[in-house]
Amino acid sequence: MTVHPPLALEAPPERLPGEPDRTRASGPTLYARLVLHALATALTGAVTAPLWPIFLASVLVWGWPPTAPAPAQIVRYLRLAVTATPPAPGLPVGVRAWIVVSVLKRAFTAPVFGLAWQLDELLYGRALDETPVVAPLFEVSAARSGSTQLARYLEEDPRLVAPSFLQASFPYLWLWRLAPATVGRFVTAEQVRHAIASRLPPEFLQRHEGDPFRTDTFEASLFMMHLNHLSPSLGPDVMIEDFSFAVIAPHNRQLWERTFVDLLDRVGRKTLRYAGPLPDGSPRRLFVKGHFLGACDAVAARFPDARFLAMARDPVARLQSAVNYIRANPIETSLGAPPWGWLGAALAENEASYCEVEQAWFSRADGPRRCVVRFADYVRDLEGTMRVVYRACFDEDAPPPTVPKTHPPRERTNYLLNRPLHLLGVDEAALSSRVRAYHEWCGA
């Protein structure tokens, strides 16, 4: 195993003048919120208790659903909440208690989300098994690489169909079919967009142009269904293991190589079935965007004719954006954001590892069909870049007319959170040295 020099500097200050207050809750505020959190969790446990016998019976028929955290992960996170010893500012008792309650609440909801998944198996299981997934396209790129914008362009190809953010978050075909005939009669798509945006902090909205009805990072829903989203609150060591998209820790192998692939497979078939064929009767092709590099071999084994597409971008710029983005992300809003130093240390290691694995995986001689486009080329020549993508992934010389050929004007944003790397606790010189080969490979 290669030992790399540390990429983290001393912990930076938690708040600078002019920054929004994202510091972790403490004192009376934390404990008041904790009491409410515990009461809500106890109520959730009481309400869902009668569902457990039905849920466990369904597990005997269809197996453990990918929408519910595995018992082993629940036990692990309860143990970590008590025993984890991250660096300063550490884990106060109130924060540990908050994490314990959050884990229990997620465990108590397992029958709800699990039975919602199993209902699809009861109603549509055979039809889904018979739904073909032919030559799917998977865009697998590092976070903050420009991959979401590229995915939105590809979505304009009517032959492709991608699960939207809402579909990935609520992956139940029966619900997709029920919603338009019920809630959809009274609530418009624009009202849904506004309702979701109003719950997100402005510093997050500045960095992520989300649309619940369009494609987004697919595995984000996996993290929220399970417990990985809590890892940043447990310190950098836990985050390095459980918030990594490239290097799979031994205890996460089942999650990524089996649970994730099953989720991807089933949601893909549901998406194809829900969308239906093209007007001429020809089938659509599945398209999924994410960062699931560590699972690519397992995905390729499930879909041998798949195409894999990556956007390669300067990792230093990506990391600076990623740390600010995660700090702004309302993962546990009432608890507050993880400390800057933890985020910088964990994401620097994960970013460097991602670069190493991505370069190796997309460069090796064997494996599935792959295509890499450089961010610099993508920005400078979108039309030429899309031609490269379509030749490699579609065996066509050019995309259809519906796919954009030029970038729309982009407004520059004065970010509310926009720290440089040295104020994120990251040693930029050490990072640049470690990713030098990748930097040359991606043409940054």
Walk through the language-model features, giving the residues of each.
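Glycine-rich phosphate-binding P-loop
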Residues: 139-157
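N-terminal pre-Walker A segment at the start of P-loop NTPase domains
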Residues: 105-127
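Post-Walker A helix-loop "phosphate-sensing" segment adjacent to the P-loop in P-loop NTPases
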Residues: 157-166
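Short His-Asn-centered micro-motif
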Residues: 140-142, 287-291, 312-313, 375
